[in-house]
Amino acid sequence: MRSKYIVIEGLEGAGKTTARNVVVETLEQLGIRDMVFTREPGGTQLAEKLRSLVLDIKSVGDEVITDKAEVLMFYAARVQLVETVIKPALANGTWVIGDRHDLSTQAYQGGGRGIDQHMLATLRDAVLGGFRPDLTLYLDVTPEVGLKRARARGELDRIEQESFDFFNRTRARYLELAAQDKSIHTIDATQPLEAVMDAIRTTVTNWVKELDA
């Protein structure tokens, strides 16, 4: 079986870190142990600097980051990560487990910011070509639940401080995109933790077994 790229998506507070741990545990039980982990934005020296610029409220002083500048920084970080980390890992037979990928931009910037979706799709195709994750786990949680969890963790970044309306639009776009793409599996992350973990295990196990079929 060739290596695969699995991405975990969701709003702030959806439980992506816990989900990643469950995915890793499940893959190991299935005999898959050669894995690397990525996060977006970030994952390379350049991408981490861009992450700081786009998420750290203090990084640009009083200057307002425009919506299009934000999108372009996300894509600059993403293509650097894809070309220098993700693709080489996959080519070497290593599975890649990612905390966010392009679906985040389509949801946050396309839904939350209201940026033209055709423009975003065109930009994605120009930058990434046909490169896509093999499996995406979208952890669906309401902004009320997710932001309560995120705020309990401590200081919020620039995007985490957006309004409930912003996150409601983002969630709606996530759900819309998930309904259109069979590679995106929606997990109800408002359930008790054990139920969420079981759903992730079942989804990943069944998906890997289908690859072997």
Swiss-Prot record:
Gene3D superfamilies: P-loop containing nucleotide triphosphate hydrolases. The keyword Transferase applies. Its EC number is 2.7.4.9. The keyword ATP-binding applies. SUPFAM superfamilies: P-loop containing nucleoside triphosphate hydrolases (SSF52540). Pfam families: Thymidylate_kin (PF02223). Keywords: ATP-binding, Kinase, Nucleotide biosynthesis, Nucleotide-binding, Transferase. It catalyses: dTMP + ATP = dTDP + ADP. ATP binds at G10, L11, E12, G13, A14, G15, K16, T17. GO terms for molecular function: ATP binding; dTMP kinase activity. GO terms for cellular component: cytosol. Phosphorylation of dTMP to form dTDP in both de novo and salvage pathways of dTTP synthesis. PANTHER family: THYMIDYLATE KINASE (PTHR10344), UMP-CMP KINASE 2, MITOCHONDRIAL (PTHR10344:SF4). This is Thymidylate kinase. The gene is tmk.
